[in-house]
Design a protein with these regions (language model features):
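N-terminal active-site segment of His-dependent metallophosphoesterases
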Residues: 2-55, 185
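Cys-nucleophile CN-hydrolase/nitrilase-fold catalytic domain and related Cys-dependent amidase chemistry
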Residues: 34, 43-126, 190-217
Length: 269
């Protein structure tokens, strides 16, 4: 269950003094092909696990892609949580590799749709977060998140989640930090902003590093590559340390996995 204690009353918790290997899985996503994307994610998760990853982050909507024609189409790709196939896939992978995994998907609850990040671990489903700041056509198809910004206690530390545009607002990071999160896992689809001067392609890495520094917290952001109608994705996945510096990345515009060994107890120093 999420921890939502006031800042002044955080109880003592288990501290992991050993580094946790964090992996951001940067992959292409085939639009509207869930079977292919799950198979591909499985291969990437296996690779990350073979390199000792204990916490893995997948991109935003990693099973479906992002651009749709209308709400009816979005609804046809939505799943329930935790019963749906995508969540159960992540549960299976977490148990198989004794790892924690974060990934974003389209969630259905009744007639409402959400952009939802899932956290699974070695013991199964842990919790979910629903995107607060909807972007582009999402505002016509999905509901803003209604779960707040939970922080989940795990054996490796306190984990929080954000999704894409959430990471462009400093308040979201601050809410994670005030609840004593050790690491924020961001599933995102950073798109190429043509107005930025070279060599910059997106504001994502800069904002990630700035908010890691200002909140003395680890931030791991996994984005994607490839293109969809009207959008192209330049990569740039990054893991930032408590001093704001990049521990890994920004990643190039190719399928890859970046790794960083993060001593999550550094957030308490």
């Amino acid at each position: 269950m999420p921890d939502q204690y006031p800042y002044s009353s955080i109880p003592p918790i288990y501290r992991n003094e050993n580094p946790v290997r964090v992996a951001c899985i940067q992959t292409d996503v085939k639009l509207k092909d869930i079977n292919f994307n799950i198979k591909h994610a499985k291969q990437m998760i296996e690779e990350a696990a073979s390199h000792g990853a204990e916490l893995m982050i997948l991109p935003e909507l990693f099973t479906t892609g992002y651009t749709f024609q209308n709400r009816k189409e979005v609804y046809s790709y939505a799943e329930t949580v935790p019963e749906g196939a995508t969540c159960q896939f992540l549960v299976e992978q977490s148990k198989l590799y004794s790892a924690y995994i974060v990934g974003s998907m389209i969630e259905r609850e009744g007639d409402d749709l959400y952009n939802c990040s899932i956290l699974t671990g070695p013991d199964g489903f842990i919790g979910k977060y629903r995107k607060l700041h909807l972007c582009g056509d999402e505002i016509y198809w999905m509901e803003p998140g209604n779960l707040g910004i939970p922080v989940f206690r795990t054996k490796i530390g306190r984990i929080s989640m954000l999704i894409c545009l959430d990471g462009f607002y400093p308040e979201t990071y601050r809410l994670c930090a005030l609840q004593k999160a050790d690491i924020i896992c961001v599933s995102t689809n950073w798109s190429h902003v043509k107005a930025l001067p070279a060599p910059y392609k997106t504001m994502g890495p800069t904002l990630t590093m700035a908010n890691a520094l200002s909140n003395h917290i680890f931030v791991a952001a996994a984005t994607r590559i490839g293109a969809e109608p009207g959008l192209d994705y330049p990569g740039q996945s990054i893991i930032a340390g408590v001093n704001g510096g990049p521990l890994a990345g920004p990643a190039p515009d190719t399928e890859t996995i970046i790794y960083a060994d993060c001593n999550l107890s550094d957030t308490r120093k």
